[in-house]
């Protein structure tokens, strides 16, 4: 089995991604169609765009207040429905996703461009995460490359993620979360596992639940490979790092409330 370096894989993947993206998305460009799903008032236009623009303004106001000596972190907004918790409401729209910080630069004139760019960029990152996982497992380079393309240009993307861009987030997180599982099995540092659990939890609670189930199933499938390495000690590690991530999240929520 011939192993390919990360740089070679990334270069080949980037070129292949660009070619396939041009083929897949050309009709959108040719017909002047945006990725925003909203011709008949669907979620893209009625919810996602509004949530992202709100988030961008929220971040700008937060830094504006800090610059002017007022440390304010609003947690409630009466303009959301009949009044709602800001972070709790926006969590559904993956506002906790670090990539959404780019919307601090959003306004009415560039929001469509940012929205379209971030959808394609997330798709690209999902393939990068798949490649990182495959390379970590020392799989064949051609197999990794083929798998990454099949993974991202799948039915999930064309049926759901192209309408709801944050559906791409679990496609980015899953390979990295599974890599974290492998690292714990191999008695390596658990930092990647903790990081991915934390990011998944703050991004979207629905997908966090699904990713947790996937990680457990994967850990059980991989168990025969590592059963001689002390199963109960390894199980204890998995059980321990999830609460660590949760405690970290709760600490930040408490600070925000104060």
Q: Which ranges hold each PLM region?
A:
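Transmembrane-helix signature of polytopic, membrane-embedded enzymes
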Residues: 130-153
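Membrane-interface alpha helices of multi-pass inner-membrane proteins
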Residues: 191-205
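Start-transfer (signal-anchor) and selected internal transmembrane alpha helices
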Residues: 1-31, 237-242
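Membrane-interface transmembrane helices that cradle and orient dolichyl/undecaprenyl
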Residues: 177-192
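Hydrophobic core segments of transmembrane alpha-helices in multi-pass, intramembrane catalytic enzymes
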Residues: 123, 166-178, 210-218
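Conserved small/polar residues in nucleotide/adenosyl-binding loops
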Residues: 247-254
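Membrane-interface coil-to-helix junctions
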Residues: 22-127, 149, 153-171
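Perimembrane helix-loop-helix junctions
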Residues: 211-243
């Amino acid at each position: 089995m011939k192993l390919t370096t990360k740089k070679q894989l990334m270069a080949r993947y980037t070129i292949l991604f660009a070619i396939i993206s041009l083929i897949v998305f050309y009709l959108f460009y040719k017909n002047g169609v945006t990725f925003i799903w909203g011709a008949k008032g669907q979620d893209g236009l009625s919810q996602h765009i509004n949530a992202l623009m709100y988030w961008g303004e929220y971040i700008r106001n937060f830094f504006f207040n800090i610059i002017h000596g007022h440390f304010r972190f609003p947690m409630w907004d009466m303009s959301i429905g009949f009044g709602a918790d800001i972070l709790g409401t926006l969590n559904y729209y993956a506002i906790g996703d670090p990539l959404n910080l780019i919307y601090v630069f959003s306004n009415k004139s560039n929001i469509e461009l940012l929205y379209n760019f971030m959808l394609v960029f997330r798709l690209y990152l999902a393939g990068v995460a798949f490649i990182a996982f495959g390379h970590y497992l020392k799989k064949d380079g051609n197999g990794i490359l083929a798998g990454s393309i099949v993974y991202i240009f799948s039915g999930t993307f064309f049926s759901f993620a192209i309408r709801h861009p944050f559906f791409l987030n679990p496609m980015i997180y899953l390979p990295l979360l599974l890599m974290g599982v492998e690292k714990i099995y191999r008695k390596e540092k658990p930092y990647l596992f903790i990081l991915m659990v934390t990011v998944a939890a703050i991004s979207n609670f629905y997908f966090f639940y699904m990713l947790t189930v996937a990680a457990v199933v994967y850990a059980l499938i991989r168990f025969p490979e590592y059963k001689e390495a002390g199963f109960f000690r390894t199980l204890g590690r998995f059980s321990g790092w999830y609460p660590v991530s949760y405690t970290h999240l709760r600490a930040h929520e408490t600070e925000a409330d104060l």
